[in-house]
């Protein structure tokens, strides 16, 4: 998630992965995985809750973005803090070190040293685990979910590959993306991973 704070896709400091590979990973793998929230909300009669979370988060993000830079920082702090909370589910238990610490270190090291670490984590751990965790909801209505996930992936990929620079370089669009991610995390934490 830390990639969203970076102002331009070409400024992402990596190692092996190039900006174009980042772009394809973000738009084709990472961005669409949250659509399973919609499937879950339909099956579990939580559509109202899902829409409330997304509405409140988007409106709140918009309101925050109207203030000075110190207040705007609240959105980034919320974004990173909730990412740490969310990613803890993927972290190992090693020597009683809290999963939150591993999650924090993942983001910190990715931001400071190389976004390749984060991209590989998302591709090889988080997104596959996300689908695995949500498989019980996906398999209940396979065709609906195949169509939903495929359509979302195609849309994210096409929009992202055509407009990613615009999104990343426009604070309004960037805040919308952050609020969508925050909404996904809140919904997952409250209704799926609780």
Give the positions of each predicted feature.
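N-terminal signal-anchor module of multipass membrane proteins
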Residues: 1-29, 177
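Hydrophobic core segments of alpha-helical transmembrane domains in multi-pass membrane proteins
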Residues: 21-30, 72-85, 116-129, 171-180
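C-terminal transmembrane-bundle signature of multipass membrane proteins
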Residues: 129, 136, 140-194
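Hydrophobic core of alpha-helical transmembrane segments in multi-pass integral membrane proteins
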Residues: 1-11, 51-66, 102-111, 145-161
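Membrane helical hairpin/interfacial module
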Residues: 24-45, 52-61
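Membrane-interface helix-loop-helix junctions at boundaries between adjacent transmembrane segments
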Residues: 43-48, 55, 61-112
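Generic multipass alpha-helical transmembrane bundles of integral membrane proteins
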Residues: 105-140
